[in-house]
Amino acid sequence: MSARVLTKPQGLSISVKVVPGASKTVIVGFEGDFVKIRLAAPPVDGKANRELIDYISKLLSVPKSKVHIQSGLTSKRKVIRIENDDGTKLREILSSFESTEPVKRS
C-alpha cells in the first residue's frame, strides 16, 4: 500500500479523491495515491463534504466528531484525518481493492 494511509500518534490521515453527484456513496478503488470515493451528495453548500464525513464515520465505526477534512475543503482531492484510529479497519477495507484494476482518471 502506498502513501494513501498515514498513521500518526494522534490518528491517521487518508488521501481521497471524491466524485460528487454519483448515484450512491461508495469507495471505487484507487487513483494514484488517492482512494477514490463516489459521493451521492452534490458539491453544493458543503453537502458533499458532510456526506464524506458521514460515510467515513460509518465505514470505520467512529464518531463523526473524530473525522475531519484536514485539507481540500473546496477541492476534489482531500486529506481526511481520523482521530485516535490506528488504521487497522481502514487498511482491511482498502486491501480488497489492491488486487483490482487501477481506477482510470476521469
Residue ranges and their predicted role:
Residues 1-46, 50-54, 62, 68-73, ...:
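Contiguous, often N-terminal, cationic amphipathic patches that form binding interfaces
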Residues 57:
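The alpha-helix within a helix-turn-helix
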